[in-house]
């Protein structure tokens, strides 16, 4: 049958490329498994594993079969929600690892018994949502002032990171590395070679972000600003960095040559600001800043590289942005 079909399609020719030799089926299966494992980020897989382990431990503790029936899932949520607010989210990890073993998982997860237990757990816990405050221009200037006062390379790096995070609307995870080195991915690191200088602007290539899962890359462009000017700061930093680290590939490096980590960032960040602010504050701050200028939501969404659904959730749950937009609209009317 296969040869008949090939003949009807014009023979075995597939392209002008060199013919591809067959692979051993075991090697193909191993390759397929490798690709499946890499379908999600390692950090996501680690979080999923946490949820799956929690569910398995629950079943062992209560002498229940692993089969995720509606009753078992309901019991799991009822038990876990006493201790953690993320119990319903853990079911995503359970699904990831057990779906192949139990194909009916989605139907059971959507069962009215499970849905009502999840809804009840959220209402009973009623955990408040704590949003980090947006960073303001005065905060950025504070970090620049520290760098100018100390003359420290690492303090300059910190000021540069925050300026880039703010004006580039970055997630901090795009500029700094996780503390867990096993989760670091060289492909995501911004490279020194991608930096391009022009008269009044500078740009680099962001190789990956959440809305770009296939590493197509995005050019992040900075223009001159009155406060914590990213163009001037990056020029100064890159000149100093090149003298220290020469041809090392990563753009953002500490004085000792290591990548800036989350713990390093937190130490510097919270030396000046309190816990009402966080790593997401620069991104929130720039969105708020743009809104205060009357920039439309669609432009803010594009600048921040948000997916549509994520942006709708983001702007709805950050009233500061709505306030700034309303004030900007009033100013434009007058």
What does each model-identified segment do?
Residues 1-334:
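Extended, non-catalytic subsegments within catalytic or DNA/protein-binding/adaptor domains
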């Amino acid at each position: 049958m296969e040869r008949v079909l090939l003949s009807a399609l014009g023979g075995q020719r597939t392209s002008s490329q060199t013919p591809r030799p067959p692979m051993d089926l075991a090697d193909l299966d191993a390759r397929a498994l490798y690709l499946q494992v890499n379908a999600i980020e390692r950090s996501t897989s680690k979080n999923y594993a946490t949820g799956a382990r929690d569910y398995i431990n629950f079943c062992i503790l209560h002498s229940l079969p692993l089969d995720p029936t509606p009753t078992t899932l309901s019991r799991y949520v009822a038990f876990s929600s006493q201790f953690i607010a993320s119990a319903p989210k853990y079911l995503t990890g359970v699904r990831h690892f057990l779906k192949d073993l139990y194909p009916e998982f989605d139907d059971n997860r959507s069962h009215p018994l499970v849905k009502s237990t999840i809804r009840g757990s959220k209402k009973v816990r009623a955990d408040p949502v704590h949003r980090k405050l947006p960073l303001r221009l005065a905060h950025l200037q504070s970090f620049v002032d520290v760098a100018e006062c100390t003359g420290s390379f690492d303090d300059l790096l910190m000021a540069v990171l925050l300026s880039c995070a703010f004006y580039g609307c970055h997630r901090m995870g795009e500029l700094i590395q996780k503390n867990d080195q096993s989760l670091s991915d060289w492909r995501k690191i911004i490279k020194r070679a991608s930096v391009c200088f022009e008269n009044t602007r500078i740009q680099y290539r962001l190789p990956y972000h959440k809305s770009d899962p296939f590493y197509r890359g995005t050019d992040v462009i900075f223009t001159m600003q009155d406060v914590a000017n990213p163009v001037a700061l990056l020029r100064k930093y890159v000149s100093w960095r090149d003298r220290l680290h020469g041809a090392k590939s990563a753009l953002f490096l500490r004085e000792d040559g290591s990548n800036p980590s989350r713990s390093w960032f937190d130490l510097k960040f919270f030396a000046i600001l309190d816990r009402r602010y966080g790593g997401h504050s620069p991104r929130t701050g720039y969105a708020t800043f743009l809104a205060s200028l009357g920039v439309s939501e669609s432009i803010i969404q594009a600048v921040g590289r948000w997916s549509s659904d994520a942006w709708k959730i983001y702007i709805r749950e950050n009233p500061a942005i709505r306030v700034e937009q309303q004030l900007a609209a009033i100013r434009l009317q007058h």
